[in-house]
Amino acid sequence: MGPHFKKTVTLDVGGRRLELRVAQDLFSSHEVDVGTRLLLRTLAGPEHGARRLVLDLGCGYGPLGLGLRAAAPDRVVHLVDRDALAVEYSRENAAANRLEDVEAYGSLGYADVRAVGFDLVVSNIPAKAGAPVIEQLLLGAAEVLAPGGLVAVVVIAPLRERVAALLEGSPQVEVVFRRATASYAVFHYRFGGPPAAAAVPADPGTALERYQRQEASVTRGGVAVRLRTAYGLPEFDSLGFTTRLVADAVLRSGSRPPGTALVLHPGQGWLPCLLWAAARPGRLRLVDRDLLALRVSQANLLANGCPPERVHIGHRVDPDPAGLRDADLVLAMLRPREPAGSTTATVLSLVAEIPRGARVVLGAGSTTITRCLAALDAAKLPVRTVDRRRAKGSSAVVLERR
């Protein structure tokens, strides 16, 4: 099942029972949430049956889009999410439930959507996305809708009035249906004006502007960088203790510039930008589940003078083993809320795949680092600990492949 797997949940829709595999750290991992079920019920009427091309924006493990696909056998459904783990689980759930004509892929908002002319766009709007992002998720659907196409969204109750005001205050929006409960609100709406199907989805750079929060600068070991940070990512104004420890470990090493460096979970881009400013690696590979982190880090590297041809991004749950085999240096910020088994498996893979003489710098809570070192010792991998530092419950360790 894999280290992220938590359980299987069920969803009854269109006379079928779907069995959906759920990851521990995806939204609504206990059961299909009430808001999703409410939105599906509002779309169950015969008037919606002819909506053939469907986009599920922010799909998670797929209950909305796959539920709509199960309800109408001639539908084609696109499932998109900025989280590669969500995309992976949506794809697996479509296959496990024998639902064809389903595409699952990564997209930052509408920027990477592979089609236009959708008859229906659905979304369970994330409550913590930030006002500019929520506005884009609600109004940006005009870029991909067919003429007469419908948008159907569900929001939690605290967002109800804000969303209603935004939709009712937009002259091209016609709200055609509303339903509210104590905890959720559903809105169905259309866009007037010129046909939207001729529109082209915004490019990733334009989409990224919606997430921009502020400018911030950091100096470590005499190396200074300045970033444009984003909503939805940590460390928007300063470095956390773990990032400081990893940055200091890299700057302290004083070794020759790496030909290829890989940064796992780059966040806002502090580590790759500090590494670029200090060592000028020949290639910088950025790997993350979160497409926002990849795009923000890439933009910040370019703003700090890194040539675009040197930056490569991988929207993946874990690094591609082939991308590790020529890496001289790997910086891995281990995700704090990831299942312990997943974190350990990632570290074992990193150390097993890098070439002899390459180094891995791990950053995490001290307990996590100790557990990973014990797993490496038990696996008897040829690796030595070069350095380890601790501060405020955080830890960074430098490992070298022998």
Segments (PLM) and residue ranges:
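Class I SAM-dependent transferase core
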Residues: M1-P46, A196-S253
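Class I S-adenosyl-L-methionine
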Residues: G2-H4, A157-R220, A230-L233, S366-R402
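General small-molecule cofactor/ligand-binding pocket signal
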Residues: R21, E103-Y105, V176, V311-G314, ...
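Conserved SAM/SAH cofactor-binding pocket of Class I
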Residues: V34-S123, T242-D320
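A short helix->loop->beta-strand "cap" motif at the edges of active sites that frequently abuts
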Residues: D74-R75, G149, P281-G282, P355-A358
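A short SAM/SAH-binding and catalytic strip from SAM-dependent methyltransferases
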Residues: D119-P132, D328-G341
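A short glycine-rich, Lys/Arg-flanked "PGG" loop and its adjoining helix->strand segment in the class I
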Residues: E135-P147, A345-G357
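Conserved beta-strand signature within the Rossmann-like core of class I S-adenosyl-L-methionine
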Residues: G148-I156, G357-G365
